[in-house]
């Protein structure tokens, strides 16, 4: 392409090159599930689907802190999503998080159940739900 020819993006972008490398299977340039796989659901209201990555651990730490201060309803079941094996692209996980990224959580104490994904959004949701660890109003909330 020379400088005098303007770039015109295609109407539908398609990935034409296979990814390579060690971590190629944890990201994809397209959305949607690659396979059917139901997610397990335990006995507690909160179901966390994650892996022990920095973002995954953040949510687990907050849930444990909520339990430590005696917050009723903060009990949870944690389920391993092995991103190295592509678990995040299963239909059950994609139903919760269409971005196919960990962590993701489902709150079954609401009707219908609330799907929350991305670590920051989950942490804010939990702080608001349990009125703990974050100011709820005013400048303190922004700071």
Regions inferred by a protein language model and the residue ranges of each:
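GST-like domain detector, emphasizing the conserved glutathione-binding G-site
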Residues: 1-143
């Amino acid at each position: 392409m020379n400088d005098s020819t303007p770039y015109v993006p295609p109407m539908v972008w398609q990935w034409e090159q296979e990814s390579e490398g060690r971590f190629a299977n944890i990201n994809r340039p397209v959305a949607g599930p690659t396979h059917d796989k139901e997610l397990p659901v335990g006995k507690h209201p909160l179901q966390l689907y994650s892996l022990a990555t920095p973002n995954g651990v953040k949510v687990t730490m907050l849930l444990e802190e909520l339990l430590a201060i005696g917050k009723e309803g903060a009990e949870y079941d944690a389920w391993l999503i092995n991103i190295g094996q592509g678990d995040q692209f299963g239909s059950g996980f994609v139903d919760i998080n269409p971005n196919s990224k960990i962590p993701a959580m489902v709150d079954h104490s609401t009707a219908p159940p609330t799907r929350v994904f991305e670590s920051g959004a989950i942490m804010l949701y939990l702080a608001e739900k349990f009125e703990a660890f974050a100011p709820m109003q005013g400048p303190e909330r922004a700071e």
